[in-house]
Amino acid sequence: MESVTLSLPEAYDLALEVLSANGFSADHAAAIARNVTAGERDGCASHGLWRLLGIVDTLRKGKVSPDAEPQIHDQAPGIARADAGGAFSLLAYERALPLLLEKARHNGIAALAINRCVHFSALFADIEPLTEAGLVGLACTPSHAWVAPAGGTRPLFGTNPIAFGWPRQDKPPFIVDMATSAAARGEIQLHQRSGKALPEGWGIDSQGQPTTDAAEVLNGAMLTFGGHKGSALAAMVELLAGPLIGDMTSAESLAWDNGAGGLPYGGELILALDPQRFLGAQAPEQLARAETLFMGMQEQGARLPGERRFACRQQSERQGSLSVVHCMMRFAPCARAGKARSAATRMPVKTACRARPARCSRHRPAATSSTYQRSDTGARCRTAEYRRPAHRCPAPGAAYNADP
């Protein structure tokens, strides 16, 4: 398969330039570029640069705001809320994260509800900042109704990912990030692009018959993992990140899309728990017991969740480059143009998952170390002069099938 090799800074520049050229504000473009570059760096091609195609397509269809400023609300002692205003979720999460961390450390447990957001990204990027802060994290979000319930033949659930993270001292965190469907939808789309057959059990066609044809599954329905067990977990996500936080279910998201083919719109729920507040002086001892569990898994030859991703990250950072498949070749000249820039003007991709000041012609990021740093109030400016008509999206609980 044809590919192009990009350095990590070039990959970030590619994403940033594509997003900016299509009308995203500086802050949103930087947040999205950090995320898709991190996915590519970590070997998660289904959530890497390839996602730019769907991101730009959703904007062109008027299904996402390119410049909405997130509104952060201190709702209750243990609850923070971020209204994304119809934009992608990433910037809203970055802006709300300091409040979530503060509440978790004060109360021992805290929740963040992100409302009115368009979502495409892997949840490990939302969980990892919590584990880096020494917290346990849990996140979930619905999507579009693409998945049939166990025993059913028509889409009702979304892929409904769940992510869980556990902090570890001087080691990569233990992070589970999984769809409740048998596979992520992006994986099926990549199979379709490459002409590969799907594994059995991933989906059914429009007549409810099992199939390994990716196109037939995309036109029919995906299946949950583990039959009725995955179906129950998918229903749980619908409730937790839908009605509980006043936002859409996957079926409502698809109805709101009204056939446009945009990315899912709705809410996300993130929980943060502080072991220090739960355990006090016993925290080191109890966290050490968790390490015994991990060792027991590895001694039997089991691979810890996230282990492959962190290995890919180390390899990408060691090599300093990525091989991007042909579906991104159309953007290669844009990335190559970035070679003429000084390295000091490029975003350090090693910390791509973390919030940083947006990059524009007036505010360039300074070189930083490889440790994770977060700027909560970093310099930001808006340079994208292109503006689309104002994006309109329903408030939670509104008529979801309204013409957008």
Task: Specify the residue positions occupied by each region the protein language model found.
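A generic, well-ordered mixed alpha/beta core segment in the N-terminal half of proteins
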Residues: 80-169
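Small-residue-enriched flexible segments
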Residues: 185-246, 263
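Catalytic-core signal marking the mid-to-C-terminal active-site face
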Residues: 2, 6, 11-14, 250-344
